Amino acid sequence: MDNKEPSLENKTVESIPAVTIRFAGDSGDGMQLVGTRFTDTSALFGNDLATLPSFPAEIRAPQGTIAGVSSFQVQIADFDILTPGDNPDVLVAMNPAALKAHLDDLAPNGMLILNEDAFEEKNIQKAGYKTDPRTSGELDAYRVFQVPMEKLTKEALEDTEITGRAVLRSKNMIALGLISWVFNRPLEDTENWINDKFKKLPEVADANIKALKVGYNFGITVEAFHHTYVVDKAKLPEGEYTNINGNIGLSWGLIAGARQAGLELFYASYPITPASDILLSLIHI
């Protein structure tokens, strides 16, 4: 499979004002990373946006169970928005548990992208389904796209230094590459980020970039995807903008409040997701 980034030629592109996308999977599937990367790429493109990450309440919930599902929702728009959206227009479900946990929120006729390799009988039962939801009729109200993410990942990495179970750690890049194609997001920014993050592990960087491009190319080569979408740049006042989440906003508020009050800031916390960002922000002061 050609790993070069394809052009936008010969595609039917539909312009839409906004879209809400939710990525969902096991807490180890890298959905927060995928959502954050898509968000950052959209911000650099010029969209306005808002995000809503969601983490399992349980510590070390069993893999493949609803209790262990992690999700990341983002709304991008060509106008000023204030919320991460309500019902997602697109749901990426990495396993049956993610589908079970989030399907009811998906908008009617919404796009549903499934990691079909995860829909084994044991995983279907573990998620609480009595029958395979893909054949029971309960997905008939949606546009379903089944993607063999694990198979594609193994094929993409077969000539790399990554082996064994570590190979499937890159399957989230398949999802990110595909969504990047569907919404005409460039890959260059994510490639640069991957190279910087794994500059001491070039073999890992290479593997993730390969998977990213394979996911992107999958959208082109599979006939099921008839066209793509584009959300144009938002018309916002000129100035400098930055992406922050609630934790970083809270950190900045604590710093500003302490300085205005002339007090020394003290913060006590346990370093666990999703509160770790507060500690990471405050250690720099």
Predicted regions located by residue number:
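Carboxylate/His-rich catalytic cores and anion/metal-binding grooves
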Residues: 209-210, 256-273, 279
